[in-house]
Amino acid sequence: MSNAITMGIFWHLIGAASAACFYAPFKKVKKWSWETMWSVGGIVSWIILPWAISALLLPDFWAYYSSFSLSTLLPVFLFGAMWGIGNINYGLTMRYLGMSMGIGIAIGITLIVGTLMTPIINGNFDVLINTEGGRMTLLGVLVALIGVGIVTRAGQLKERKMGIKAEEFNLKKGLVLAVMCGIFSAGMSFAMNAAKPMHEAAAALGVDPLYVALPSYVIIMGGGAIINLGFCFIRLAKVKDLSLKADFSLAKPLIIHNVLLSALGGLMWYLQFFFYAWGHARIPAQYDYISWMLHMSFYVLCGGIVGLVLKEWNNAGRRPVTVLSLGCVVIIVAANIVGIGMAN
């Protein structure tokens, strides 16, 4: 396995670790509605950071974006909005299926759709079937899916042992939402594929290869921001028990505390895709769609590890922890199989 591929896998692991940890600051926000908290964090992660970093990277910010036709930018934006819809469905999936089943189904579907639809759309799926490296890579995707399934099973055992139930269990509604979440969340993978002309233009301007994907985030995350912020603001305006004004009428120290923690959560959310861009840059071009598989499987891996570190599994008993550990090992094996496949 080449050093470039190894570093690509490593940066995807770092990005996934940030994704697994980003909600921790949000949990410490006090006396704010979820909608206000999510909006503040989202403004940081989807608007401020993408724009600020792109302004630092690009020699002429406005000239860069105005150089693209609407036919180039619109698919990137719409796929970003597609991801935004998946993001909202994610929370509803947890509500109706519970954390473990919801995450397992949603992540499993988005892993498959986001990874395999890209080469199918690009007409490159034959590379996976007809080459040794491609078949090895496909095997890695399958093993990763098995690993996600094992971790999901561990979560179910934990919830059963600890008496944790879904907020409002509804299998039919939850499965529909989980499938929608999985499909729509893959929009981020499709957006990265559609944004290749933007990456090439950034490279032509002298932007370091590690950073060429970052300017496209202004458009991708702009699409996601409109969906997420629109959803939050509509709820803040229409739901009787929610009030943006009330949330910002608290004591000043508490408001500052909440804003800083929400901003930190937003920063950590953004960092997942900052390092995703680094990992993506190191993956061989013919296998760039594997970035999504690495990110999503590592997200499940890191989520399990973070749960162990935070002692969320302390009262779950030995069997769930053993199954979780097995699932994590399988995901690590999958990453190595994919790496070997890409090297071939």
Swiss-Prot record:
Its main location: membrane. The keyword Transmembrane applies. Keywords: Cell inner membrane, Cell membrane, Membrane, Sugar transport, Symport, Transmembrane, Transmembrane helix, Transport. GO terms for cellular component: plasma membrane. It is a multi-pass membrane protein. The chain crosses the membrane at residues 4-24, 38-58, 68-88, 101-121, 137-157, 175-195, 214-234, 259-279, 290-310, 323-343. It is found in: Cell inner membrane. GO terms for molecular function: rhamnose transmembrane transporter activity; symporter activity. It catalyses: L-rhamnopyranose(in) + H(+)(in) = L-rhamnopyranose(out) + H(+)(out). InterPro entries: L-rhamnose-proton_sym_RhaT. Belongs to the L-rhamnose transporter (TC 2.A.7.6) family. Uptake of L-rhamnose across the cytoplasmic membrane with the concomitant transport of protons into the cell (symport system). This is L-rhamnose-proton symporter. It comes from Escherichia coli O139:H28 (strain E24377A / ETEC). The lineage of its organism: Bacteria, Pseudomonadati, Pseudomonadota, Gammaproteobacteria, Enterobacterales.
